[in-house]
Regions:
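Protein-protein interaction regions
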Residues: 1-72
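Membrane-proximal intrinsically disordered regions of secretory-pathway and membrane-system proteins
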Residues: 58-259
């Protein structure tokens, strides 16, 4: 569930239920704070949405513009699904989703154009467009996790997270920088070149680990945790770069795939 909060006159989020409960437990969020979920017709008190229970254990709460990406590491993987993806994946896994992403890619280009001018003139990224773009990326991460054999199961069609062990969140900033907006014109130079060079070598290593992981699952039904973490780190690093380039975040992406 993706929850948005109304703080300091701005809609911020999305957050997960666990993150909201952690904020309630830490006292950084008042029980009467207004919250909203896409299934609700109007804003309600946050405790009505997540209940009065507050968790006190450590839960990762992203700062503004921070990208949080998770792919669950399974204790065991299915050999049958692995072989199905290897021999028939292009038919039932790659082509159907890729066709959707081609169409969505056209829409995303228009969204980026609208968002750029909106930030330049108003200092704000339209909330509806922000949610749409984020939801497309959440779908793509869910799909790519299966293509890369990091998760079993078929990725659900549709926008947003689906609670299937793969999730990606970007905490929407309350204010967007016009300066960063203008700087995006030069993003291919100061973002694309340094990060592209690093990711090129990471992706080469990722291809080698993809093959190694395939045979590890085939013979042992287990995907080595360190290899899984590295591959997820590639996704996380790439998504941070995409979030900055597409103005979902003003945080310059770190040169790391670590959480």
């Amino acid at each position: 569930m993706q929850i948005y909060l109304f703080l300091n006159g701005k809609r911020v989020g999305p957050y997960t239920v666990e993150q909201v409960q952690a904020m309630l437990g830490a006292g950084t969020l008042m029980p009467d704070t207004q919250a909203w979920h896409e299934t609700l017709p109007d804003w309600v008190a946050v405790t009505q949405l997540v209940g009065g229970m507050a968790v006190t254990e450590e839960v990762e709460i992203p700062g503004e513009g921070e990208v949080v990406l998770r792919v669950t590491h399974q204790a065991e993987y299915s050999r049958t699904q692995l072989l199905l993806r290897a021999f028939f994946g292009i038919i039932y896994l790659i082509l159907p989703h890729a066709a959707c992403f081609v169409l969505l890619g056209v829409v995303l280009n228009f969204c980026a154009m609208i968002a750029w001018f909106a930030i330049l003139f108003t200092g704000s990224y339209p909330a509806g467009i922000y949610s749409f773009v984020t939801s497309v990326y959440q779908w793509s991460v869910r799909w790519l996790a299966r293509v890369a054999n990091l998760m079993d199961g078929y990725p659900a069609f549709g926008m947003g997270n689906k609670g299937d062990g793969v999730s990606m969140e970007i905490a929407r900033p309350a204010i967007f920088s016009r300066r960063h907006c203008v700087l995006r014109i030069l993003a291919p130079i100061y973002v694309g070149i340094p990060h592209g060079a690093c990711l090129l070598f990471r992706q080469i290593a990722g291809i080698i680990l993809f093959v190694a992981g395939f045979f590890a699952v085939l013979f042992t039904r287990k995907y080595p945790k360190s290899m899984h973490d590295f591959q997820v780190g590639n996704f996380r690093w790439s998504m941070r770069v995409m979030a900055y380039i597409t103005m979902l975040s003003d945080r310059y992406p770190p040169f790391s795939g670590k959480p």
